[in-house]
Structures are given as structure tokens and as C-alpha cells.
Amino acid sequence: MEGNGSVDMFSEVLENQFLQAAKLVENHLDSEIQKLDQIGEDELELLKEKRLAALRKAQQQKQEWLSKGHGEYREIGSERDFFQEVKESEKVVCHFYRDTTFRCKILDRHLAILAKKHLETKFLKLNVEKAPFLCERLRIKVIPTLALLRDGKTQDYVVGFTDLGNTDDFTTETLEWRLGCSDVINYSGNLMEPPFQSQKKFGTNFTKLEKKTIRGKKYDSDSDDD
């Protein structure tokens, strides 16, 4: 009987806690409803106008990005094209690739997906054979390399797959996280944790290259397939 008494007392405590929680929720809802009731027609109309203005601004920004070639992963044909494209957009990701490097095709697939998702960033690809001067200027020596640019200046590089877990099977989300770490996309996840991967596997240091002239024009492949 003593056991039944303990159970009854425990049930009563739980019931009281539940009632208290329900009361808090009810009070919060009453408070929000009261706030809405106190908003006059003029204030409500002002809120609607602000919301509509924000929506119009967002739509205009989207159209501007699309007019500049955002929203798709595109190939450019020359160094001159590169400088023009970078000049037009605040955020740019450019894949320096070579046709014979297998890992470039892996990056192509992921970048095509991210280009559609992140309209705020322009996604490009450029064949290194068509851009010898630019590759020297940016120290592009390993293929594939992603140059990450903001306001016309190179912010960072993703060289090979080192920052992506040293695996060909990295996810699109992992590349998205890496680009977010360099602030070239609007990333909404947790930058402290690479998605779906072990933090230890990635480490914390990213490969960054300085803007210096290199001696040779030979490109090293990060892929086993040439």
C-alpha cells in the first residue's frame, strides 16, 4: 500500500507540473493576443507595407542576380571573361579545372546543385589550359582548385579535396559548409561542425594560397586519374 501511495504522489506532482506548464503557455498566448488587439489599423497597415516592401526588395535582388548569371553553374572561356564576371558580382566561386582530371567532374556535380540553391553567389568554371596568366597570378598549381572571391578579391581557396575529408564521396552539404566557412555563400548551418562527417577527419586548418607569381606552369593533379 505504501508503494501505491508513492505512485499516487508522483502522479499528482506530474499533474501539477503539467498544469503549471499549460498555464504558462496560456498566459503567453493571451499576452500575444492582447498585443495584436492593441495594434491599431494604422500600425497594422504599416506592418503590411513594410512586409511587402521587404518582399519586393528581395524579388528585385533575385532578378538582379539572375540577370548577372547567378543561379546556374557556367563555364567561361577566357581570362578576360573571368575578370568581367568577378567585377559584376560580390561573391564568386570559380572552379579551375582540367578535362582529364577525374575529381573535377565530381566537383562539377556538387557545384551545379549549389549554384541553384545559393543565388547570392556566382558559380563559374574555367579550364586552366585557357588561363595560364591567371593561374600564375592566383597560384593555381593543384587541380581541381576553387577560388573563392568577394568584391573582386580572392578570399580563400579550396585546393583538391583536403578540406572536404580527403574522399571522393563527400556530400554536397560538406562542400556547402566549406564555402560557408569562407563567407562566400549565406550558410545557415553550424560552421563549427562539418555536416555528416567527423570533425577530426577534417581538422581545422584550411589550405590558403598567397597571391605570388609562380615559376612554372605545370599543374599537379589531386586525382589519381589524369
Curated annotation (Swiss-Prot):
Q: Where in the cell is it found?
A: Cytoplasm; Nucleus; Cytoplasm, Cytoskeleton, Microtubule organizing center, Centrosome; Midbody
Keyword Cytoplasm annotated = yes
Sites bearing Phosphoserine, chain numbering: S188, S221, S223
Q: What Gene3D superfamilies does UniProt report for this protein, alphabetically?
A: Glutaredoxin (3.40.30.10)
Q: In which tissues is it expressed?
A: Expressed in testis, liver, heart, kidney, brain, spleen and lung.
InterPro entries hit by this protein: Thioredoxin-like_sf, Thioredoxin_domain
Q: Which cysteines are joined by disulfide bonds?
A: none
**Assembly state and interactors?**
Forms ternary complexes with the chaperonin TCP1 complex, spanning the cylindrical chaperonin cavity and contacting at least 2 subunits.
* Protein's UniProt name: Thioredoxin domain-containing protein 9
The record lists the organism as Mus musculus (Mouse)
